[in-house]
Design a protein with these regions (language model features):
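Extracytoplasmic/periplasmic ligand-capture domains
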Residues: 75-91, 105, 189-190, 255-279, ...
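Conserved small-residue motifs centered on glycine
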Residues: 370-492
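Helix-loop-helix "hinge/cap" segment bordering the ligand-binding cleft or interdomain interface
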Residues: 137, 163-232, 246-286, 290-291, ...
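Carboxylate/His-rich catalytic cores and anion/metal-binding grooves
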Residues: 122-153, 160, 207-211, 222-248, ...
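Extracytoplasmic/periplasmic substrate-binding proteins
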Residues: 60-62, 232-243, 270-423
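Conserved N-terminal structural module of periplasmic/extracytoplasmic solute-binding proteins
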Residues: 6-10, 14, 26-183, 187-203, ...
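N-terminal secretory signal peptides that target proteins for export/translocation
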Residues: 1-5
Length: 546
């Protein structure tokens, strides 16, 4: 990531709460933030030194720490934190994508860390319901001047971090939002075939068919295809049809017609032969990504694309050009797919902590501007230097990749908005191949996708959806998997299993497992919380600078 200077259907809950949905849990801390520029302080400068606390703090392990740097819990940056922070911290490694299992093991063995850093809202809600968390109001007031300033500047953080008992249990960060998932199309292929960027569903099918049948790469082989229904490609079709719960007449409702339209279009793409016939085996979309970057796929739905996306494509397709495109407008409206969550709760304190004061002091130190800048940018004149505006600018990219690239979760709770406003505007590093061209593509993407007139298709960001009660969560999970199976069956079965048959079976399944209870619960939640809930419309108040 570059440095910044100038920066309802029946499938309703399938999309919002399906296992495997990538949300910010997978998102990497952004190059953004700390409006609360309060230095870490120690009470009573003239008084005797306070006794140094000792705590445990969880830290995601993504398996990306270079051997030369040590381990994720013992490296130059964890040592720096212990040398400069107010407490002795024992970092506890938690596998990023198996965090719940690891935390459960730690709780069961009585080894839960004092400070728990966890992106997943549902798991933090579970810990709250099990009374495993400490309320933080008094601790923040007494020991966290930096976070107190954050709450004054962004009072919505307190509201989001407060649980039903009226007490604040979670600390979080502000990350100016930008597009997370966007659709990219091979414009050199469009030019060769004299086709425009598709604006309607029929045009999308026409372009996908041409990319599949008319040899757009000119190699004389039938080895390209137009679209992938794998992973995010499937969600993009749902988004195109607004296929989720939505607000109508100030109520949260679903619409079977939206689901049927989405399923029908997926089936149409498959029947026309314009998608990978084996897309169901591409569970995480890696094959689709590989096919796009190797020049075999014409339209790709990308998650957090960056300059490497373009550089990799150009490595095997030197003349390739790409552009962002919106999914076409349908009778249900026009929507985008995913945005980064601008208000992200990240951190809680274990109710069994032996030194909650030390835990809070350490957390406040970790989110201080001086701290996050050190962790994010590294050492001055080694990893960065100030530019002409006095903003930190990366140097030695290869060294940074080795010595800094693995440490992003150390500042996952920090609002990394520079107190010097001009330093939050992105600057292009011209030393990086394709950086200038990618910057233009990125700005085009943001112009298309960061528009409240073409909103996210979901009610809100996944992390701001309420957590279902355990019984309804099981019902919803069962519905998610079984409904997906039925939809996949009709998509690939030709005339032997029609969309109408699938819709009838989905209706029966919904009644059988009691999914209506889940939808009713969400509708009631919306009715009770619509005035205070953080919804899609609110995201556009927190857009990143361009």
């Amino acid at each position: 990531m570059g440095d910044y200077r100038k920066k309802s259907t029946l499938l309703a809950v399938v999309t919002l709460l399906a296992a495997g949905t990538v949300a910010a849990g997978c998102s990497k801390p952004q190059e953004k933030s700390s409006g609360a520029a309060v230095s870490p302080t120690k009470a009573g400068a003239s008084a005797a030194p306070e006794k140094r606390g000792k705590i445990k703090m969880s830290l995601y392990d993504r398996g990306n720490t270079p051997a030369a740097e040590g381990s994720i819990t013992n490296n130059r940056w964890t040592k720096w934190i212990n040398e400069n922070g107010p407490a002795d911290v024992e970092f506890v490694a938690v596998p990023r994508f198996e965090s719940k299992q690891k935390f459960n093991t730690l709780f069961a063995s009585g080894e839960a860390p004092d400070v728990i850093n966890e992106f997943e809202t549902g798991y933090r809600d579970q810990l709250y319901s099990q009374k495993q968390l400490l309320p933080l109001d008094d601790l923040v007031k007494q020991y966290a001047p930096n976070y107190t300033a954050m709450l004054e500047k962004y009072p919505i953080l307190r509201k989001i971090g407060t649980k039903p008992d009226g007490k604040m249990y979670e600390m979080g960060r502000v990350i100016p939002s930008s597009v997370q998932v966007a659709v990219f199309i091979r414009t050199d292929w469009l030019k060769k075939l004299s086709l425009p960027i598709p604006q309607t569903p029929d045009e999308l099918l026409k372009v996908a068919k041409a990319f599949t049948e008319q040899d757009p790469d000119g190699n004389g082989k039938k080895d390209t295809y137009g679209y992938s229904l794998a992973y995010l490609g499937d969600e993009a079709i749902d988004a195109m049809h607004g296929n989720t719960m939505f607000i109508k007449d100030d109520k949260l409702v679903e619409d079977e017609a939206r689901m049927k339209a989405a399923v029908s279009f997926k089936k149409r793409l498959f029947d026309e032969g314009v998608v990978d016939r084996d897309y169901l085996t591409d569970k995480n979309g890696e094959k689709a990504k590989k096919d796009f970057l190797s020049g075999k796929l014409g339209i790709y739905v990308a998650d957090n694309a960056n300059v490497d996306f373009l550089t990799t494509l150009r490595s095997t397709n030197k003349e390739a050009t790409i552009a962002p495109m919106l999914m076409p407008k349908t009778e249900f409206g026009q929507y985008t797919i995913r945005m980064l969550n601008p208000l992200q709760m990240t951190t809680v304190v274990y109710a069994g902590s032996k030194d909650p004061a030390a835990a809070m002091k350490e957390m406040d130190f970790m989110l201080a501007e001086k701290t996050w800048k050190t962790l994010k940018f590294g050492t001055e004149n080694v990893h960065w230097k100030n530019d002409e505006l006095g903003c930190p600018r990366a140097i030695n990219p290869d060294l940074r990749k080795i010595e800094i690239g693995y440490n992003t979760d150390l500042y996952m709770s920090a609002t990394t908005i520079d107190s010097k406003e001009i330093c939050n505007i992105p600057v292009v590093n011209k030393e990086i191949p394709n950086a200038e061209e990618w910057s233009k593509i990125k700005n085009e993407t943001r112009d298309l996708y960061e528009n409240p007139a073409v909103p996210l298709y979901t009610l809100t960001h996944l992390e701001h959806m309420p957590t279902l009660p355990a019984d309804l969560l099981k019902i919803n999970n069962d519905w998610t998997q079984q409904s997906k199976d039925l939809i996949a069956k009709t998509v690939v079965s030709g005339g032997s299993y029609t969309v109408d048959q699938a819709m009838n079976d989905l209706k029966s399944l919904k009644q059988k497992i009691g999914q209506n209870q889940t939808l009713d619960w969400y509708a009631k939640w919306y009715e009770q919380n619509k005035k205070n809930a953080f919804l899609t419309k609110d995201i556009y108040q927190f857009l990143a600078k361009k």
